[in-house]
Amino acid sequence: MKTGKELKPGTVLRIDNDPWLVQKAEFTKSGRNSAIMKTKLKNLLTGYKTETVYGADDKLDDVILDRKEATLSFINGDEYTFMDTTDYTMYELNAEDIEAVLPYIEEGMEDVCEAVFFEGRLVSVELPTTISRKVVYTENAARGDTSGKVMKPAKLANGTEISVADFIQIDEWIDIDTRDNSFKGRSKK
């Protein structure tokens, strides 16, 4: 059993005996009302999508999933093909199925992912919590602006934008926390 506040993208719930994948989860807490979790869910059997709100303390039936290590093999349009690192089996997913990790996926990436299976079927892919990516564009630092933690926008090779520290330059490798899309520092790559 999981509570509403424990939901995150990639979690699979059993609702009316169907497996539902949490594609997006946003925790909201206001001063007056109790905390809630706004979620976007996708039925893994029918593909139907819905938005649902759960209370932070609501009890939900989660599903035990099989997990295997996999790497991105290639991208063909909206189809992403992953390969099992132990037996070299190929699995395909649509862009919709991996919407949560799509900003970090790029051709030629070397990160080992975790392929998530429900009853023998690949349902999603989870990335490591920290990944390294190359900055392809960023503005120069503003002179004299050194008060506090100064951030600026940067663009990665796949077009994703992220806020980075002021000292990061073009062609530098950075570490990114995939849980909250935050800049962690320069990569040792």
UniProtKB/Swiss-Prot annotation:
Pfam families: EFP, EFP_N, Elong-fact-P_C. Glycosylated ar Arg-32 by EarP: arginine rhamnosylation is required for EF-P function and rescue of polyproline stalled ribosomes. The keyword Glycoprotein applies. Glycans are attached at residue 32. SMART domains: EFP, Elong-fact-P_C. It comes from the Bacteria. GO terms for biological process: peptide biosynthetic process. It is found in: Cytoplasm. One of its GO terms (cellular component) is cytoplasm. Keywords: Cytoplasm, Elongation factor, Glycoprotein, Protein biosynthesis. Belongs to the elongation factor P family. Involved in peptide bond synthesis. Stimulates efficient translation and peptide-bond synthesis on native or reconstituted 70S ribosomes in vitro. Probably functions indirectly by altering the affinity of the ribosome for aminoacyl-tRNA, thus increasing their reactivity as acceptors for peptidyl transferase. This is Elongation factor P.
